[in-house]
Amino acid sequence: MRILRSEKPLKKRDEIEADESLVLVYQDEVHFQIQTTVTSGWYKKGSAPTVKSFPGRFKTSYSGFVIPESGVLFTAKPEMFNYSTTIDSIRSFINKHPVPDRKKYALVMDNAPWHKKTIRLVEQEALPEYEDIRNSVVFVKLPPYSPDLNPIEQVWRITRRENTHNVFFSSLSLLEETVDSAFGAWAVPNDQLRSLCTFK
């Protein structure tokens, strides 16, 4: 299995898109905190407004995969982020969205430590337990500190802006329902993410 190294990421992206044996996929993880995030508001001059916020530091976590070709978003909900949950999330993705015949997913990932370990184990160990991933995925490593090259970051930004900013959540389950609903709308082919994630 090849590991494509993104020394010139935009050129590499164009090469991947032109390669008929590859289907481009962007992956990333995200936390949504239950604390109220205030981004704007109106209040009288001289007043001292208060903002309701849940008294705790709870969060819900997601591992996301977006296919620019279709705009489809797939999310898994790991309890934590490590190499084991990354492998589980990749498997969940390729089980839900089997790779087309005679193709592989070009899976773009950042340099999180658990991503590095996932790539090392799947590539170097070559154990039978990882064969399904090796048969379906080519890893593409983003340059360090380049979230602007991973458009799934914009998916997280839009989700926060349209669903969680300036909203009080009285329980973690309400936050999860809100985020799950937002992601569910993108679980089928759609123009919004197709446009957002193609760098056109």
Per-range role (PLM):
Residues M1-K200:
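Short functional hotspots at interaction and active-site rims
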